[in-house]
Structures are given as structure tokens and as C-alpha cells.
Amino acid sequence: DPDLIIIDSIQTFTMENALPARAGSPTQTMECANELLRLAKDDKRPRAVIIVGQMTKADELAGLRALEHLVDTVLIIEANSDEELRGLISSKNRFGSTGETGFFQMTEKGMESIDNPSEYFMTKREDGDLVSGSTLTVVKEGSRAIIMEVESLVSKTFTPYPTRIAETLGKDKLNTLISILEIRGGINLYDKNVIIKTTGGMRVKEPGVNLAVIMSIVSSVKNKGIPTDVAFIADVGLTGELKKVPSLEGRVRELARMGFRKVYVAKDSFAKGFKIE
């Protein structure tokens, strides 16, 4: 009688004696899940049950939403097929906080924890070794502040429609930032291909990286590198003005811990009297 039950995956299981429906159907999936719930919540013999499910191309749980409501915790493993990085995200947790992310590296031994994500996401370069198109910022993943590198490559296009690639950022956000840079910054990119990437293939949704993305593009266009001890943390409005981002103090403390000397932020971002110990 096991203490731990792992089902991989719920869409392949059936209760043949109870239901004639095929495996993976909504009815079968919910009946199997309810039976597993009964086993887990048995007062005389409680067990831990882990249900492995499938994801859709839209990064949502496949199947009925009721399945997500049935369980106590939902953990999602995010990955890009061409990267070793794996992110373990808690999207639901009845017994703790959500929005937290754990980072792992896929190796021949399996998933191994990345204990210092900030160091992992930065390219190690010698002092004075400046590379154009590279900037650094700090993102928040749950309660953690993580330093991340943004890379861009800008080149002349020879087609009527320039290429815009930003898998980890989002094409719509990239086009918006390019428009701001053209109108407010006076840098023409209508005849330029623009490719944006974050080291490790980390997906970025928060607006606090926008200034770093813009400065990365400018650095690539001008072919001038930015010092490796400088970071950019701010949103950029359609007017071209810098906007504050939340949890800035924690981000700056992470930069100080890693030896950074300068950070560009929006005006009046810090509370009066803020100091880095």
C-alpha cells in the first residue's frame, strides 16, 4: 500500500469498470481524478498523489478547468526546446504562496537546481570586454530578484518587411518598444531587422525590462558596448518617459550583492532615506 502515488499522465488513464468513455475524454479524466482525490483524502490511510498532466500550445493545462480546481497545488514546468533551462512555477497553492519560480538545468542526470540564478543568466566577461547589444536588468520571479541579460542584434534588411524576433519577450511588445525608440528617440529602424533574446531563454512578461531592451537595441545600432557593471530597471511609456517598477529596492540590493555600481531607474523611484546596507 504506497504512501506516494504518481500518475503520468492523467489523460492516459481510464476506469474501465465504471465508464465506457475513451481515455482522455473529459468524463474519464474527471472520474479518475475524483478517485485519486478519494485515495488522497482517505482518513484512515491518507496518501500523497502527484498527477502529471499535459499542456496546450497556449501554455495552459490541457483538459477541463475543473481538474485544476480539484487539486491542492498546480506546478508547471516551463521550457524551450532548444534550451537547458527549466522553470518550475507554482500557479496554485492552497498551503502557501503562488507565483514563486524555481530554476533548474536539464543535465544527463536529470533536472539539477540552479542555486544562483543571477549568475546563471549573466554572460561572464572580463573587465573592459564590452559587447554591443548586451544589457543587464533585474526581474522579479515571485519573491526572488534575478539579474538577467538582454541581447539584441540589429541588421539592415533586404526585404520589404524587416524581421522582428523576440520569442522570450513577445513580438507585440518588441514592436511597441521599436515604435517608441523611433518616435521618441529618433532612431530609424524601419529598414532594420531586430532580434531580441534573453540568456537562458527565460520568458519575460513584466514591463520593468523595457528600458534594458531599448538600451540593448541602441547599443547594437551604435555598435557600442555598455559596461558590465551597469543595469537598467524601468518601464518606458509611449511618451518615452521612464516609469517606476514595483519592488525596486529588492532588485537594487541584488545588484549590489553581485557587485554592480550603477543602475538607471525612473525618477523618484526610491523611498526617501533608502540605503543599501
Report the location of each language-model feature:
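Peripheral, non-AAA+ core regions of ATP-driven protein-machinery
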Residues: 1-4, 10-52, 56-277
